[in-house]
Swiss-Prot record:
Natural source organism: Mycobacterium leprae (strain TN)
GO cellular component annotations of the record: glutamyl-tRNA(Gln) amidotransferase complex
Gene designation: gatA
Name this polypeptide is given: Glutamyl-tRNA(Gln) amidotransferase subunit A
Domain of life (superkingdom): Bacteria
GO molecular function, one term: glutaminyl-tRNA synthase (glutamine-hydrolyzing) activity
Residues at the catalytic site: K85 (charge relay system), S160 (charge relay system), S184 (acyl-ester intermediate)
Catalysis performed (reactions): L-glutamyl-tRNA(Gln) + L-glutamine + ATP + H2O = L-glutaminyl-tRNA(Gln) + L-glutamate + ADP + phosphate + H(+)
Subunit structure, interactors included: Heterotrimer of A, B and C subunits.
Function: Allows the formation of correctly charged Gln-tRNA(Gln) through the transamidation of misacylated Glu-tRNA(Gln) in organisms which lack glutaminyl-tRNA synthetase. The reaction takes place in the presence of glutamine and ATP through an activated gamma-phospho-Glu-tRNA(Gln).
EC number(s) given by UniProt: 6.3.5.7
NCBIfam families found in the cross-reference section: gatA (TIGR00132)
Amino acid sequence: MIGSLHEIIRLDASTLAAKIVAKELSSVEITQACLDQIEATDDTYRAFLHVAAEKALSAAAAVDKAVAAGGQLSSTLAGVPLALKDVFTTVDMPTTCGSKILQGWHSPYDATVTTRLRAAGIPILGKTNMDEFAMGSSTENSAYGPTRNPWNVDRVPGGSGGGSAAALAAFQAPLAIGSDTGGSIRQPAALTATVGVKPTYGTVSRYGLVACASSLDQGGPCARTVLDTALLHAVIAGHDARDSTSVEAAVPDIVGAAKAGESGDLHGVRVGVVRQLRGEGYQSGVLASFQAAVEQLIALGATVSEVDCPHFDYALAAYYLILPSEVSSNLARFDAMRYGLRVGDDGSRSAEEVIALTRAAGFGPEVKRRIMIGAYALSAGYYDSYYSQAQKVRTLIARDLDKAYRSVDVLVSPATPTTAFSLGEKADDPLAMYLFDLCTLPLNLAGHCGMSVPSGLSSDDDLPVGLQIMAPALADDRLYRVGAAYEAARGPLPSAI
């Protein structure tokens, strides 16, 4: 009989869901075990910004009541608790986006992702820490302090969604939701030995996802196994009329693909290794782990060839013009007049002065930096030289990928150039921080889908390494087939704690 905290929190989500249905464990027991783990460990890891214990237990009790009555559960994951990145709006919890300017703010509506989680009977444990407004690669830019990596508390968990990844690695939650603007799901997953997926742009609603860069942002699932990630992906995916960027195409059978992949047969699958995403600047242990993963894919029956994506060399420059440009526009709404922080409103100052004081006090250094870069790139006289050119490069990157997929089914690369770096190591060097997104951001520019799946520990420092699997738009099922096959062949890995 499974019942101890140590045993419960280490079970994967699909196992927990089966035990709820079989009445071997209750959702309340599972949720309480996660809450106990959060209480015991989060002073160290700081994965959560807000914990909603009573609300989570109430949602869990509703699932248990349905099980006891013999009724049909609302989803395969009903009763399995989840950690939600604090960039998705929630009516019953604060939504801060890791920023002082939204401290204590409650949204008047739930994000579509939040609504779908609730409808699926998934208890929400709370909101997880993140880089302010999803701007960062380490979760050090949170106004509420950094999250620490459970594998080594002196290292970062990645960003911007380091809180969700750390919660999974620390066994505080079996499921999590993140958002990915340039790698903010996949990169933390790689650094914490968890699984993270950036779905095809437009297939998971952005309604209620507080915008960083609207053409790049995409919500997605995180878990500790590929199958669990697929099950969660299926819950949140689908068209939403309230999101103008939502696509109406049918969601592929990602759960079926994950289950098929567990057989370990990749015969007929063509895999491309991106030449531009390895080599100089990559940690030797990361490259060794990547090469071993490629050899494992070959052993499973896949054919592997090298693929050239020449415009990837310009992806970083294009991304860091497009993203700040959209940031400068999106964050103009935080003006002290409509919601959030208001500073200096004592009747003696003009509206312009109040806005300036509020934004100066409410935004952190990285957010201010990107607003300034974006405003410059969009200004008269520079638009054609910078922003317009970056959009042309974006088109060329998408064409590189389209050409690649004529000869292969998926692409692979390391998910990050190195393992987790030390807290504070890149804090004063924005360019070094930006370079850490090198492997992941091309997919956001193209709107394609990608997954990071653990590929072992680096021989350099015994820290996790992630294998990135990429597929064309609306071919998310390919990620799950290849990812599940690789995961099954790779075998179990040690845990962080």
